[in-house]
Amino acid sequence: MFKKIEHTNYSPIQPVLVWDGDCGFCKFWKTRWELKTKGKIEFKTYQEVANNFPDIPLKEFKKSSKLIEPNGKVYNGPDSAYRCIYYSGNKIWHKLYTKYKIFQHLSDHGYNHIAKNRSFYFKLTKILLGNNPTSLKHFWIFYLLIIIVLVYWVL
């Protein structure tokens, strides 16, 4: 499980999401959030900028993404994703994460599971949403309809 780091003494000029540049799943969602946040967040790989934050252990950058704000506040794992979404104007996910311990627990464990199975979830993401993160296709609706029809037909 990733460690929740709360603060860095090496704050950036603007919010920065630090992610794993070797992860296709991470790159897919980084591209999506970069489009949605419209320049409000800088996106950098930990391979590029880990040395800029010497008080955050490299192993923690490898375990989870980090959103680091100009005041030094650090958001980790799923909350770094929710905070990115927050910057795009959808504040509900970050609020749920900070307000409800059960949502935080499920998010943290879900994130940890996905982090350990990135290849599988990257394939699943592309099957359900398409290959282009800037123009998502909602194939999952079609798959759901097929399942509903098959279940109805069998019963």
For each feature predicted by the language model, list its residue ranges.
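Short secondary-structure boundary micro-motifs
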Residues: 1-2, 6-7, 17, 49-52, ...
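Local sequence-structure signature of Cys/Sec-based thiol-disulfide redox active-site neighborhoods
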Residues: 2-36
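Charged, low-complexity, helix/coiled-coil-prone segments
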Residues: 19-28, 47-58, 110
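Short, well-ordered coil/turn elements that cap or connect secondary structure elements
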Residues: 36-38, 62
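Juxtamembrane boundary at the C-terminal end of a transmembrane helix
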Residues: 148-155
